[in-house]
Every structure is written in structure tokens, then in C-alpha cells.
């Protein structure tokens, strides 16, 4: 039986629980995961450093493209076993189950939050019920097919340019960050950043406890770097994180609308896990970095609301009310007392947002809920009883 949710639904309030980081983990250059939080922060968390004098040198964000160490598409999808390993490690250290209704990746919640202003983008997710919680993941099979189809239908020259645009984002991250605080880095290390081989294997992932309305969420999201320092004595690290982005320099009124859409998505992904600062590098068509702007996440809704483009105005509060309503609906409609799996989809053609129970789900469940995680939760409940 299909259950549908009206797209015009809105929650009365937008009470978002203040995100709090529970733990972090990382993926290294070899694609291996590291779960020791202290080691992860010391060795896998970068620091932002890009003075105006460096920007004035017109950095080429396309340099080194031919040497790009890119992770294969099929390996660069949200890794649920890695997330569950992190959850398991955290629960073992506290001796208690994390109190969340939904466990998922920030990127998937970003898609749901921004849906009112991205009605042309399809959504295909799986919801696996286990131990009274909803584990939401991407439908990787459909996602990979969609990417392959898009590549097949695109002009090869345009496809190559899109790859270079993608690369320029990783290059910007490489030239604007340091592996240690500025004072601990040699002049040579700072000045040779432009020569560094760029990769998208390395990731630092923050896992935060948050929520909207009465629904409690655990979200895992990649963090690009720190603005300043790691606070001592276990104080909140989230205000120190930074999101890095690149975009084309704005030279015509029509480009403003495109940038506002991009800024809205960046606001959503930063807001969801409590990142308060966003740095945009603006490049020209030749991938030369022209200027850098710093935005405070909390100010973006006001900027978007004050836009002169009335027909394309994005209201973040409207998106939040949708998000609150749809997350509550998902949480209420999917029974948590039976270990089943569901398909959660948005179809742009029919404009329908729906969930349907999956009958043949054993392979899916086993690919998400690992044996180690099951054994841990069983042993945890035994000690509790």
C-alpha cells in the first residue's frame, strides 16, 4: 500500500533542536576509515588559511586536473556500514543506545529540506527499520543509473567541462586549507599547497544529534575544515567548522538566480548540522579564482528573502516548515515495532511524495545493518535487561 504526503504540507512550528556533535570519523587517502576521534581531529581535520594576498595571485583552480585522484562513483556513496561502526563505537563508550528516531546522512536530509524549491529533482531513498529506529539511505542502484544516463546524454565537451568544475571545488579546498594550524606549518608547506595532488578520497565526517519538532535525528555530514581552532575540554566544536564552496563569478542578472539556488542548498546542508560559516571561492570560465566571500549561515535566509527576484524568491522558513512536516510524517507513518524496509520517493513527473513497503528486502537489510551492529545491539539489550 502506497502512502502519499501532500507537497503543500507545512508544520506550524520550525523548532529545530540545536545540533550537538557526538563523534567524528574519517576516510583516508586509501579509502580506509578511522574511528579514533582524537586521532581523527589531529590528523584528518584541516584549517582554513587563504589570505587576500594569495587570492590576488589569481590561483588556477584547474591546475593539476590530469593528476586528480578521484574515488570511483560506486565507492563515493554514503557508506552506512562505516556510519554504523561509528555509532557502535560511541554506544560502546557510553554503554547506552543513541536516542534517535532517524539515523541517516546529512546530504539526504538536505534533499528533503530543499525539495520545495527543487521540484524537478527526483528522490529515491530506502528506509530500513531496525531496533526501533529508521535508518535512511540512498537507493544507490537508481542513483548510479541516473548518473550514468546523464553522462551518456551529455555532450562530451560539456561533460569534460563539468568534471573540471567539480575538480575546481576540490582544488579550492586544497589551496585554502592547511593540515595543521598556521603557526605549526612551515612556509614551504603553505606556499606549496598549489602543487599538492588533489583527491576526493579524504573526508572528515561529523556525526551530530539534532531534530525538528518531536523527531530526534542523528546526521552524519562531511566537514571541510576549521575556521580557527579545536576547542579544549570537550567544548562545542560545531561553531568552529567551515563549509567551502566554489561558484562562477556573477557577471549578469540571470546568474544571480542560479547562485541564490546554490546558496540555498549550501545554507540547508550547513544549517542541518550546525555549521555557522561558509566560504565561497568565485572562479571565472577559465577556472581562475577571482575573489572569496565569507557568509554567516544564519544571515543567508535574510539575504535570500531580500532578493529583488520576486518570482524566484526562496524563503528558508517555508522550506523548514515543509521539512518539519514531512519528517514528522515519515516518523509517524513507518511502524518502528517491525523490522521492515520501505521505499521513500519523490517523482517530479507526478509531483508525488510517497512511501511504500518493500516485500523482498533481505539483501537490502543485510547491506545496511551489519552483523557486527546487530550483535552489538543484541548484547546491549541483554545488559540492559
From Swiss-Prot:
Its EC number is 3.6.1.-. It is found in: Nucleus. Divalent metal cation. Its main location: nucleus. GO terms for biological process: cleavage in ITS2 between 5.8S rRNA and LSU-rRNA of tricistronic rRNA transcript (SSU-rRNA, 5.8S rRNA, LSU-rRNA); deadenylation-independent decapping of nuclear-transcribed mRNA; mRNA processing; NAD-cap decapping; nuclear polyadenylation-dependent rRNA catabolic process; positive regulation of termination of RNA polymerase II transcription; termination of RNA polymerase II transcription, poly(A)-coupled. Substrate binds at residues 222, 245, 269. InterPro entries: RAI1, RAI1-like_fam. Its cofactor is a divalent metal cation. The keyword RNA-binding applies. One of its GO terms (cellular component) is Las1 complex. GO terms for molecular function: enzyme regulator activity; metal ion binding; mRNA 5'-diphosphatase activity; nucleotide binding; phosphodiesterase decapping endonuclease activity; RNA binding; RNA NAD+-cap (NAD+-forming) hydrolase activity. A divalent metal cation binds at residues 173, 224, 243-244. It catalyses: a 5'-end NAD(+)-phospho-ribonucleoside in mRNA + H2O = a 5'-end phospho-ribonucleoside in mRNA + NAD(+) + H(+); a 5'-end (N(7)-methyl 5'-triphosphoguanosine)-ribonucleoside-ribonucleotide in mRNA + H2O = a (N(7)-methyl 5'-triphosphoguanosine)-nucleoside + a 5'-end phospho-ribonucleoside in mRNA + H(+); a 5'-end triphospho-ribonucleoside in mRNA + H2O = a 5'-end phospho-ribonucleoside in mRNA + diphosphate + H(+). Pfam families: RAI1. It is an enzyme of class 3 (hydrolase). Keywords: Hydrolase, Metal-binding, mRNA processing, Nuclease, Nucleotide-binding, Nucleus, RNA-binding. Decapping enzyme for NAD-capped RNAs: specifically hydrolyzes the nicotinamide adenine dinucleotide (NAD) cap from a subset of RNAs by removing the entire NAD moiety from the 5'-end of an NAD-capped RNA. The NAD-cap is present at the 5'-end of some RNAs and snoRNAs. In contrast to the canonical 5'-end N7 methylguanosine (m7G) cap, the NAD cap promotes mRNA decay. Also acts as a non-canonical decapping enzyme that removes the entire cap structure of m7G capped or incompletely capped RNAs. Interacts with RAT1; the interaction is direct, stabilizes RAT1 protein structure and stimulates its exoribonuclease activity. The interaction also stimulates RAI1 pyrophosphohydrolase activity, probably by recruiting it to mRNA substrates. Belongs to the DXO/Dom3Z family. This is Decapping nuclease RAI1. It comes from Debaryomyces hansenii (strain ATCC 36239 / CBS 767 / BCRC 21394 / JCM 1990 / NBRC 0083 / IGC 2968) (Yeast). The gene is RAI1.
